[in-house]
């Protein structure tokens, strides 16, 4: 492609300002370039919690947003992932100590399906039964948090450290802990997607019943 063609193509594109959801005060996340608004929808943008809050101590936390709508020259997003940086996670690990992890899928009260991955770091090496008990606390606390929170309030509980503190409070009674973190949260399905999956499951069950009846 000639330089003139590239220049003309770029001139036909426009910049869209990408905003965080209202939950994050509609802060500007950056800009994205496209010829048409529908080319912007579906794109993702990642920033750090530190950049949104002005707290450099939170730069070890990455937040990912997905563009869902465009109005004029503004692109609106939804939150889809919270994740600690690899460097930060590596810095937490100590030789001669235990690292206890869990991966838990739950539904919030407004039917968002999310996967939550907590991690606990002990002061010294815990035995297998203690690690299992700590993991059980993680699972119970995450389920309890989802049972009385919307997706937005669940995300707030993680960003503000409330969920990790709740896990720490109970798990430290099993074995001394140095740290508990939520290393990752991922949005797996929205309410409409969850409902569609449930309808499909019901249809399959109905078909199986019909086959059994024919037999």
Curated annotation (Swiss-Prot):
GO CC terms: ribonucleoprotein complex; ribosome
UniProt-listed InterPro entries: Ribosomal_eS1, Ribosomal_eS1_arc
Entry keywords, A to Z: Ribonucleoprotein, Ribosomal protein
Presence of keyword Flavoprotein: no
GO molecular function: structural constituent of ribosome
Pfam families: Ribosomal_S3Ae
Biological process, per Gene Ontology: translation
Family per record: Belongs to the eukaryotic ribosomal protein eS1 family.
UniProt cross-references to HAMAP family, sorted A to Z: Ribosomal_eS1
Name by which UniProt lists this protein: Small ribosomal subunit protein eS1
Species: Halorubrum lacusprofundi (strain ATCC 49239 / DSM 5036 / JCM 8891 / ACAM 34)
Primary gene name: rps3ae
């Amino acid at each position: 492609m000639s330089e003139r063609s590239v220049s003309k193509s770029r001139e036909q594109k426009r910049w869209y300002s990408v905003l965080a959801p209202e939950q994050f005060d509609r802060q500007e996340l950056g800009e994205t370039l496209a010829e048409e608004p529908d080319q912007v929808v579906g794109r993702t943008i990642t920033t750090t919690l530190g950049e949104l809050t002005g707290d450099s101590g939170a730069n070890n936390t990455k937040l990912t947003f997905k563009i869902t709508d465009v109005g004029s020259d503004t692109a609106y997003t939804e939150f889809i992932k919270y994740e600690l940086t690899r460097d930060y996670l590596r810095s937490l690990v100590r030789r001669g100590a235990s690292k206890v992890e869990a991966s838990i899928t739950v539904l919030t009260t407004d039917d968002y399906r999310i996967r939550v991955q907590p991690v606990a770091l002990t002061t010294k090496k815990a035995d297998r039964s203690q690690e299992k008990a700590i993991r059980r606390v993680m699972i119970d606390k995450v389920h309890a948090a989802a049972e009385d929170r919307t997706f937005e309030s669940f995300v707030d509980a993680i960003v503000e450290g409330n969920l990790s503190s709740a896990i720490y409070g109970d798990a430290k009674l099993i074995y001394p802990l140095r740290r508990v973190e939520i290393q990752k949260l991922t949005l797996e399905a929205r309410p409409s997607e969850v409902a569609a999956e449930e309808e499909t499951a019901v249809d399959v069950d109905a078909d199986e019943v019909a086959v059994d009846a024919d037999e």
